[in-house]
């Protein structure tokens, strides 16, 4: 059986980074610390890699081996959705270097708001839907 403690701890760390970035992009443009944003995007990326590795190694294999077709279907849905979201995040992360943010601040702020909102929604959905199923299956 899978312990949700580590996944929830990872979510907390990821949400801290998302919240920091959300707060930073809400500042007046002249007050935004681009170096700090780049640092926290890197930190978020590392946390996401660890989280996804653990999900793909431990969480999803258990859910996909469930006797319950609904559980397997839900797991497949979450795998597909996360794949799409990670692709969007990767494009965002690779698009915006420090130089590019300076050159295209308005585009960066718009894209960052969209990506951060989608990420927060995803992790809330995991906790509210996926983790409840895992608890019920246990």
Which role fits each region the language model picked out?
Residues 1-138:
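Small-residue-biased structural context
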